[in-house]
Amino acid sequence: MESFRFVHAADLHIDSPFSGIGDVDVRVANRLREATYEAFQNLVELCLKSDVDFLVIAGDVYDGADRSVRAQLRLRDGLSRLADEGIQTFVVHGNHDPLDGWQSSIAWPEGVHIFGAAPEWKNIEKNGEIVAAVQGMSYPTREVTDNLALQFSPPQSGSIFTIGLLHANVGGNSAHPNYAPCTVEDLSTSGIDYWALGHVHTRQTLKRAAPVIAYPGNIQGRHPNETGERGALVVDVAP
């Protein structure tokens, strides 16, 4: 297997308003209004500068189900920059941006893969060789209380690296709604090598040995309780 690199991001919440900040100067307000867009552009730059092979986004790409046209266009433009450099993107939607929300008829670039409500495998090639496969599924509606992890199918081959892309509450984290609840054990027995999770906004690695189970946290704090470093995970995989 050839080595490769990918970025694991989640909870972009593009176009999210800030809460709990009161009245601020108009210049500060404008900066805050643009903050999630700037954070997304920083994510795109990270992918380009890090020479990654692909990007996975584990849900809550947008802040609301009825996502704005502006947010969708900015997402498309950013992912187009990646596609132009041969970097594929794999996306699932979460509780903030489920599939039944409104969206405009924007044509996504080739190389952008948005998963539906049923789990599906997508192969990833590098230099003509399949090096990895991603399986993901999106929320059909906002409040998903089923254990989606149990719906993922086992890998079709043991010779390639596999990634599960899921927006879920693992272990009943009380700081977040208990959507798509599952356990570390559910994920550990799946046969998948790396679980790329979203939903929890604080970076956490729930399991470091195979399979790796990780939350990257969100890329931009959205209220006074979300402070400190934010960003995404750069993951290197070697034979």
Feature-to-residue mapping (PLM):
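His/Asp/Glu-rich metal-coordinating catalytic cores
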Residues: 54, 65-214, 218-236
